[in-house]
Curated annotation (Swiss-Prot):
CDD domains: PheRS_alpha_core. Keywords: Aminoacyl-tRNA synthetase, ATP-binding, Cytoplasm, Ligase, Magnesium, Metal-binding, Nucleotide-binding, Protein biosynthesis. GO terms for cellular component: cytoplasm. This is Phenylalanine--tRNA ligase alpha subunit.
């Protein structure tokens, strides 16, 4: 068996004392409490010493009690003045007693028989009695002397005075303490008798040890790489933020161009009208979207684009008959927090794009909803589109499946037919979560020609809008979407880094 310097030192002192408290070992070895306790744990694990724990009720001085040790009990201070003057009023004692002490002093002096109390013109007057002249040490005075040296067991102090009396006068307080007594075992004594060489241990070989040759006189402490150590939590990025950054980088590596915007506010023109969504569509009502109270309206883009969108709604484009109603520019000017990131896709298409071209954006969107494990009223959406001559619906399904499996880590994926005013055909993407079952990720489709032609695009455009928060739930292994924005330090510290 191998013992370190501290273990050897404690064992040698135990051999001298046979048994001792931890406090006594601290005093004898000049080690601190932590070092002694660690040494004892090692000695006990190797059967060289035994540690016995005993719970005791202990009494120790309060701050008031410590003050009385320094300046004396109130009655002792009052008695000293009485012995000097023979007779005093309560006012004469104000310099040596506090107001609270003055209230109690008459009763204490009368109880001890140290003073005679009478009423005079000057107020209550105290006169030194014969018993006061010969006053001796009382139990409380002896108890204070004992406690001044340190805490004492209740049993020990009860031999002198009632603990209840000390607590009543707020001189002392009671606490339960664990007393550790240590004894050396026969195995420990046997090892000491064989002889223990006490050498200083070092953990670092310094230049000084080499130059002076002192390395020969010391013992090098081996490193235990399996020993438990305190966990260190270095600075770390928020897990969901890392997930978003990884997706952004992955898409850029795949050749996608990122669409950016500075504002969270859109006109209804970009949020709905440019997407060929009619102005009487129920999704445009207050139950499905937020509206801005002030300012209420924004500005429409250039007249040519507005007239094309108007024509698409009223009479149709690309062989369509449109929606057959009178389109209102006033309605299109209304401002709202962005309801979906597809509004940015419409803006990008109207600006002009590379063909073939791939575009994406990750944006915050807002929709009225009931907060639960899978729904938020403010969330992130990844929106994107690909424009090219030869694109088909199967290309879109392939991209969506890749998103679900490679990015979210989903094992099962399903597609369902769906409807959106601005795509045809349309599809819903869902994936299976082990805790929540089938979870909808988002919608997708091929942009309708009525929309793309109005925006100046003549080729097929496949597009998608996916709730990226739900993708993150799969990847980060959480079953409540609200947890992605949690302040829970345990989760933030222990969440694993992702791909």
């Amino acid at each position: 068996m191998r013992l370190g310097y501290n273990e050897k030192l404690v064992l040698l002192k135990l051999a001298e004392l046979k048994n001792a408290t931890v406090e006594e070992l601290i005093e004898k070895t000049n080690l601190d409490q932590v070092a002694v306790m660690r040494a004892l744990l090692t000695l006990q694990s190797q059967g060289l010493a035994k540690v016995h724990e005993e719970r005791r009720r202990m009494i120790k001085l309060t701050e008031t009690g410590k003050r009385y040790i320094e300046i004396g009990l109130p009655e002792i201070r009052a008695l000293k003045i009485l012995k000097e003057k023979g007779k005093v009023t309560l006012n004469d004692l104000k310099d040596v007693l506090s107001d609270e002490e003055l209230k109690a002093i008459v009763g204490v002096l009368r109880k001890e028989g140290w003073a005679e109390v009478s009423k005079t013109k000057e107020g209550l007057t105290l006169k030194l009695s014969e018993k006061g002249k010969k006053a001796e040490k009382r139990a409380i005075d002896i108890a204070l002397e004992v406690l001044s040296k340190g805490e004492v067991s209740v049993e020990e102090i009860e031999k002198i005075i009632s603990v209840k009396e000390l607590k009543r006068r707020k001189i002392a307080e009671e606490e339960e303490k664990v007393i550790r007594n240590v004894e050396i075992t026969d195995k420990g004594l046997e090892l000491v008798e064989k002889g223990i060489e006490l050498k200083r241990e070092v953990s670092i070989l310094t230049p000084e040890l080499i130059v002076t040759g002192k390395w020969r006189e010391v013992e090098f402490k081996p490193f235990n790489i399996k020993a438990p150590v305190k966990k260190i939590y270095p600075g770390k990025k928020q897990p969901y933020r890392v997930f978003l950054d990884k997706i952004r980088r992955r898409l850029i590596e795949m050749g996608f161009i990122e669409m950016t915007v500075d504002s969270l506010i859109e006109t209804q023109f970009w949020n709905f009208d440019a997407l060929f969504q009619p102005q009487n569509h129920p999704a445009r009502e207050w139950t499905d979207t937020y509206q801005l109270k002030y300012p209420e309206k924004g500005y429409l883009p250039d007249e040519n684009l507005v007239s094309k969108v108007k024509e698409a709604h009223e009479r149709g484009l690309a062989g369509s008959r449109g929606w057959g109603y009178v389109w209102s520019p006033e309605r299109a000017m209304l401002l709202m927090p962005r309801a979906h990131a597809t509004a940015l896709s419409a803006r990008e298409l109207a600006k002009g794009i590379e063909i073939p071209g791939k575009y994406f954006t990750i944006q915050r969107v807002f929709r009225p909803d009931v907060l639960d494990r899978t729904h938020l009223i403010e969330f992130n959406q990844i929106d994107g589109f690909v424009a090219s001559e030869d694109l088909t619906f199967r290309h879109l399904l392939g991209i969506l499946k890749r998103f679900a499996i490679e990015i979210a880590g989903a094992k099962k994926v399903k597609f369902f037919p769906d409807y959106y005013p601005f795509t045809e055909p349309s599809v819903q993407l869902s994936a299976y979560h082990p805790e929540l079952g089938w979870v909808e990720f988002g919608g997708a489709g091929i942009f309708r020609e009525e929309m793309t032609e109005a925006l100046g695009i003549k080729v097929p455009v496949i597009a998608w809008g996916i709730g990226i928060d739900r993708l993150a739930m799969f990847k980060l292994g959480v079953d409540d979407i609200r947890y992605l924005f949690s302040y829970d330090l345990k989760w933030l510290r222990e969440s694993k880094l992702i791909w």
